[in-house]
């Protein structure tokens, strides 16, 4: 009896074990769609970014004009540009939901998968920040100046590191050129990390909503979950196209339609909306070094989650943790909103309270799990 080529061909069988004959838990819900959607988002970003880079000019005198040229003169250039910009927003929506699902269902106990995921998050955030600088509008320039200047808070070597990063004594042409180079290369590094992320995931198998061992009853990924994931893709693409075709600049900053001017500071400097929660945490600390540490901690704190020990994987069995988790999501949304506001009352005090609560979640969550395990005994 001849075996299908997908099971014998050296290259195709790798794809087969990852996407077709992959044993998947029978009870995974729609929350497990987002990994596939992130793959779709990454594909869209690389594809649109590749074509945009053919027309973009990484020079401070020409960058803004080249983006304008792409939107006005290149065939469907406007579509490529807004797809790339809003595709980034869709990427982060899927990314944050993917992480939230991992926290809720305790997927962080898949240690290597979780750690590579945190590295991926940092890489994607770095890539998005570098891309925000490239149009060379007012917010691009001042965002780059403010955020990169935070490195000067590093004791002893901070100022030297900033000058090394800028390629001079201010954000200038050298900065733009290296940011473009890094923005071009990092998505391919992300792609390689995704392969490693999947490699570790397929060593252990996926978690499931009950958090139980599902080795006894798994089903092939295709056709069951390919159909389920394709439905998610259709919904995501539909939402993305509504955003792109009816409100393409809804999530971008009006200041970025003004060419970069080092002599005029915008009234309110802020990053893209998906970084606002971290930006609010940064601004809530009155000390520069403390703010930078809090900013880094807001993302890097995810690496401590595998240290948590609880008897059940899923938060479905921990009512107190469920309430705490949804409170944490509310805090995240409120921090995002406050990050877009001016640094004045009541936002400043609110940000400080919410920052404390944000970090308090990671202390209180394992304690509540232990308490509930004790009560249930």
Swiss-Prot record:
Originating species: Priapulus caudatus (Priapulid worm)
Subcellular location: Mitochondrion inner membrane
Keywords (A to Z) from UniProt: Electron transport, Heme, Iron, Membrane, Metal-binding, Mitochondrion, Mitochondrion inner membrane, Respiratory chain, Transmembrane, Transmembrane helix, Transport, Ubiquinone
Binding site for a ubiquinone: 202
Keyword check for Zinc: no
Main subcellular localisation: mitochondrion
PANTHER family: CYTOCHROME B
PROSITE patterns linked to this entry: CYTB_CTER, CYTB_NTER
UniProt xrefs under InterPro entries: Cyt_b/b6_C, Cyt_b/b6_C_sf, Cyt_b/b6_N, Cytb/b6-like_sf, Cytochrome_b, Cytochrome_b_C_euk/bac, Cytochrome_b_N_euk/bac, Di-haem_cyt_TM
Source lineage: Eukaryota, Metazoa, Ecdysozoa, Scalidophora, Priapulida
Membrane as UniProt keyword: yes
GO MF term set: metal ion binding; ubiquinol-cytochrome-c reductase activity
Residues reported in the UniProt entry to bind heme b b566: 98, 197
A Pfam family of this chain: Cytochrome_B
Protein name (Swiss-Prot/TrEMBL): Cytochrome b
Subunit structure, interactors included: The main subunits of complex b-c1 are: cytochrome b, cytochrome c1 and the Rieske protein.
Protein task: Component of the ubiquinol-cytochrome c reductase complex (complex III or cytochrome b-c1 complex) that is part of the mitochondrial respiratory chain. The b-c1 complex mediates electron transfer from ubiquinol to cytochrome c. Contributes to the generation of a proton gradient across the mitochondrial membrane that is then used for ATP synthesis.
């Amino acid at each position: 009896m001849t075996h299908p080529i997908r099971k014998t061909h050296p290259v195709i069988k790798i794809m087969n074990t990852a996407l077709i004959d992959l044993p998947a838990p029978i009870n995974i819900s729609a929350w497990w769609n987002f990994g596939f959607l992130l793959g779709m988002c990454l594909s869209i970003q690389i594809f649109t970014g590749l074509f945009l880079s053919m027309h973009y000019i990484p020079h401070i005198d020409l960058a803004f004009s080249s983006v304008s040229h792409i939107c006005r003169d290149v065939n469907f250039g406007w579509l490529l540009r807004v797809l790339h910009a809003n595709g980034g927003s869709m990427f982060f929506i899927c990314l944050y939901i993917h992480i939230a699902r991992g926290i809720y269902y305790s997927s962080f106990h898949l240690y290597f998968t979780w750690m590579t995921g945190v590295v991926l998050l940092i890489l994607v955030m770095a890539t998005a920040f570098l891309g925000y600088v490239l149009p060379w509008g007012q917010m691009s320039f001042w965002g780059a100046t403010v955020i990169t200047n935070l490195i000067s808070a590093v004791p002893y070597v901070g100022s030297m590191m900033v000058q090394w990063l800028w390629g001079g004594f201010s954000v200038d042409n050298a900065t733009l050129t290296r940011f473009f180079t890094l923005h071009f290369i990092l998505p391919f590094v992300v792609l390689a990390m995704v392969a490693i992320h999947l490699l570790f995931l397929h060593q252990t198998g996926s978690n499931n909503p009950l958090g139980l061992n599902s080795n006894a009853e798994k089903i092939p990924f295709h056709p069951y979950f390919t159909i389920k994931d394709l439905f998610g893709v259709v919904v995501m693409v539909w939402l993305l196209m509504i955003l792109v075709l009816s409100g393409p600049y809804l999530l971008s900053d009006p200041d970025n339609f003004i060419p970069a001017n080092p002599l005029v500071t915008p009234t309110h400097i802020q990053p893209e909306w998906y970084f606002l929660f971290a930006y609010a945490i940064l601004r809530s600390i009155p000390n520069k070094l403390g703010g930078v540490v809090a900013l880094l901690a807001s993302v890097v704190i995810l690496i401590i989650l595998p240290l948590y020990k609880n008897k059940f994987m899923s938060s479905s069995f921990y009512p107190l943790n469920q309430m705490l988790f949804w409170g944490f999501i509310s805090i995240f949304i409120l921090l995002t909103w406050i990050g877009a506001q001016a640094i004045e009352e009541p936002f400043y005090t609110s940000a400080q309270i919410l920052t404390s609560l944000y970090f308090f979640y990671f202390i209180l969550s394992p304690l509540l799990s232990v308490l509930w395990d004790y009560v249930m005994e």
